[in-house]
A protein has these predicted regions:
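Extended, low-polarity transmembrane helix blocks
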Residues: 1-38, 58-65, 69, 75-144
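Membrane-interface interhelical connector segments
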Residues: 38-53
Length: 144
């Protein structure tokens, strides 16, 4: 395979991989917010859970809104780097909540590996968006 074809395929694979990660992260945030917190537990149930952790009940509504809006913006490819970074405190809170449960997701209350993975994925999405922005000053970035 020629070097130019290999380079073109490599660039396309990188863009496709970035878009796939961004899209998947957006779907995760949306479903975690709407399906889990709103439809499964309900607003009152989610607020009650937050209160049981010693957090103000209103925090639940902020987290639901942040995950729903952030997920939609990631799916729409709007302000990707800033959205991915802005959602890190939400994931940090989730990591804090699950930290005492152990590593495995099947642990009572869920493990902390999933929030940690999502933190890393969000940082990668933000870094990729910054990299695309920096490498394409003369055109609108595909995943900015």
């Amino acid at each position: 395979m020629s070097a130019s074809i290999e380079k073109a395929l490599s660039e396309k694979a990188g863009v496709a991989g970035s878009a796939l990660l961004r899209f998947t992260l957006g779907v995760m945030y949306l479903t975690h917010s709407i399906v889990l917190k709103v439809f499964t537990f309900g607003f009152a149930g989610t607020a009650g859970y937050f209160a049981s952790l010693g957090l103000p009940s209103a925090t639940a509504y902020l987290v639901i809104a942040a995950e729903a809006v952030g997920g939609a913006l990631l799916l729409a490819n709007v302000a990707t780097r800033w959205v991915a970074l802005a959602l890190l405190p939400v994931l940090g809170g989730a990591l804090w909540v699950h930290a005492g449960n152990g590593w495995v997701f099947s642990a009572n209350g869920g493990g902390w590996e999933y929030p940690l993975f999502l933190i890393v994925a969000s940082v990668v999405v933000a870094l990729q968006a910054f990299a695309v922005r920096a490498s394409s000053a003369d055109r609108a970035p595909a995943i900015a």
